[in-house]
């Protein structure tokens, strides 16, 4: 509000100076009203201070700065006539703003009272103006307070809601995580305990089954070994005993290995599958695997036993092999000796010949004993004829010595006893060529010369004669005697292809058919069969 001009106030005071005592009573009442208004203002200021303090404590620093800046701006706009120092004070503290306003109004009222004692109208106007200012200020303060309270309450509610919402998800997440962790740990512990129990039960079952089956197999094996013990020769009996003696630890070792393998497999299955499936599948799977392995071991041992039985039946061959090995070891020259001379070589050859003669004498005496035994048993003519038949002879490496002198003599005697074979070509070639030229001059000559190198060997009658071996015993003084082995009759082997070829060449069958076919093709008769018969 604008202040009234002092000159205008001075003029009515001059004119109304005699009426000043009459307005003294009016001033007293006005002062009382002013005091009441000041008391009300002070009460309003106190309430404003309290509300400001509460809002300063509750609202954040940013909200305080914005609110104080708005308050200072509003006060500066309303009190445009205030001094710069007062504006600075108001901006610094909102509580001081209200005090300054009240002081200004109080200072203005006495001056207005002293100046306007003469004119009641001017005083009434001033009081109305001051009342309007005070009422406007109070209304602005209440509006600002309500505006401040509303945003602060809204901020409190929103912040409380946000804090509650944020706190609730964080609490819920933490509780859920802890619940999940506790549940996972409890489930892991329970599953581990169940897996351990199931694996222990499966291992116990498999071990019991394996021990039971091994006990059955161990009961079966001694009986089989006792049965096969009689047929095994004396040379092989120690090996069989060693096998039977080592069967017990060998059975225990596979059982331990099977237990370890099966326990590992059962543990893997228990970790992958449920407990109920493991209880149902562990027994059949382990039993099948143990059955296959145990049966494989049993089959291997039975095959070895049958192998021993087969070799047990051939005791004589084993004895002969042992004798031959001994002789061959004796026959081997001492190569390792550095001073091996020619005299040693001659001695070695003489020893070999003596050993060979000893072997021949052994087989001769054995053949004579067989010849003596068979007539006593009553051999028939069929048996004798069967004896004269050619039978395959099997000589061992130790019995045949190509470097020995008797073998060389045998070969020379056989070569001399075999007569030379004269082929039949010489008989047919001359006659056949003359007849061909006389009978069939137009036909080309067919060569009848064949290679009979292979047929000579096949058609040759092999006559085996036993060589006469002299037996000389230097140490024991055996008599020298000549004895022949069995004489086999001559066997003539004829090839059917060679026989048919000789027949066709003998009767000129090829030339006849060649002439007939030539005439048939040349004349081309309607009845070729009759034509061919007429030709013959």
From Swiss-Prot:
Main location group: nucleus
Region (Disordered): 1-287, 328-348
Highest taxon of source: Eukaryota
Entry-linked Pfam families: Tex55
Biased composition regions of type Low complexity, renumbered to the chain: 1-11, 226-242
Cellular compartment(s): Nucleus; Cell projection, Cilium, Flagellum
Residue ranges with Polar residues bias: 62-85, 105-136, 243-255
Biased composition (Basic and acidic residues): 35-52, 138-158, 173-222, 339-348
Organs and tissues of expression: Testis-specific.
CC terms in the record's Gene Ontology section: nucleus; sperm flagellum
Keywords: Cell projection, Cilium, Flagellum, Nucleus
UniProt cross-references to SUPFAM superfamilies, sorted A to Z: Dimerization-anchoring domain of cAMP-dependent PK regulatory subunit
Name of this protein: Testis-specific expressed protein 55
């Amino acid at each position: 509000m604008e202040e009234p001009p002092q000159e205008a106030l001075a003029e009515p005071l001059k004119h109304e100076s005699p009426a000043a005592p009459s307005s003294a009573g009016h001033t007293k009442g006005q002062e009382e009203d002013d005091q009441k208004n000041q008391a009300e203002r002070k009460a309003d200021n106190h309430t404003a201070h309290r509300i400001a303090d509460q809002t300063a404590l509750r609202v954040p620093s940013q909200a305080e700065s914005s609110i104080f800046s708005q308050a200072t701006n509003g006060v500066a706009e309303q009190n445009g006539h205030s001094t710069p120092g007062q504006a600075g004070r108001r901006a610094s503290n909102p509580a001081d703003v209200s005090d300054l306003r009240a002081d200004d109004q109080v200072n203005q009222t006495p001056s207005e009272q002293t100046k306007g004692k003469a004119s009641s109208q001017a005083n009434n106007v001033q009081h109305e103006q001051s009342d309007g200012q005070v009422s406007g200020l109070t209304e602005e303060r209440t509006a600002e307070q309500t505006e401040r309270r509303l945003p602060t309450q809204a901020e409190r509610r929103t912040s409380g809601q946000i804090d509650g919402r944020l706190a609730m998800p964080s609490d819920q997440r933490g509780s859920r995580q802890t619940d999940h962790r506790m549940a996972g740990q409890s489930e892991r512990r329970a599953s581990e305990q169940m897996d351990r129990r199931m694996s222990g039960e499966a291992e116990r079952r498999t071990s019991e089954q394996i021990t039971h089956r091994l006990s059955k197999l161990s009961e079966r094996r001694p009986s089989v070994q006792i049965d096969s013990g009689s047929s095994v020769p004396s040379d092989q009996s120690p090996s069989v005993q060693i096998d039977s003696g080592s069967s017990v630890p060998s059975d225990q070792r596979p059982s331990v290995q099977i237990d370890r393998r099966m326990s590992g497999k059962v543990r893997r299955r228990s970790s992958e599958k449920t407990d109920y499936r493991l209880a149902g599948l562990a027994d059949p799977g382990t039993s099948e695997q143990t059955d296959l392995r145990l049966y494989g071991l049993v089959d291997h041992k039975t095959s070895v036993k049958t192998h021993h039985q087969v070799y047990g039946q051939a005791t004589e061959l084993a004895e002969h092999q042992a004798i031959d090995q001994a002789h061959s070891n004796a026959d081997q020259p001492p190569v390792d000796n550095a001073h091996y001379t020619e005299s040693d070589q001659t001695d070695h050859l003489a020893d070999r010949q003596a050993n060979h003669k000893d072997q021949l004498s052994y087989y001769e005496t054995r053949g004579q004993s067989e010849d003596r035994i068979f007539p006593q048993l009553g051999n028939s003519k069929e048996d004798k004829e069967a004896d004269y038949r050619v039978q395959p002879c099997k000589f061992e490496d130790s019995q045949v010595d190509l470097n020995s002198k008797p073998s060389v003599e045998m070969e020379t005697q056989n070569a001399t006893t075999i007569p030379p074979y004269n082929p039949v070509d010489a008989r047919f070639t001359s006659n056949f060529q003359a007849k061909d030229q006389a009978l069939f001059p137009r036909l080309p000559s067919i060569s009848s010369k064949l290679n009979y190198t292979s047929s000579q060997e096949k058609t040759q009658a092999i006559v085996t004669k036993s060589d006469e071996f002299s037996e000389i015993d230097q140490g024991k003084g055996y008599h020298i005697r000549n004895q022949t082995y069995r004489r086999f009759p001559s066997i003539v082997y004829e090839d059917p292809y060679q026989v048919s070829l000789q027949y066709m060449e003998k009767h000129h069958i090829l030339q006849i058919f060649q002439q007939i076919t030539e005439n048939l093709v040349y004349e081309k008769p309607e009845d070729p069969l009759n034509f061919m018969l007429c030709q013959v």
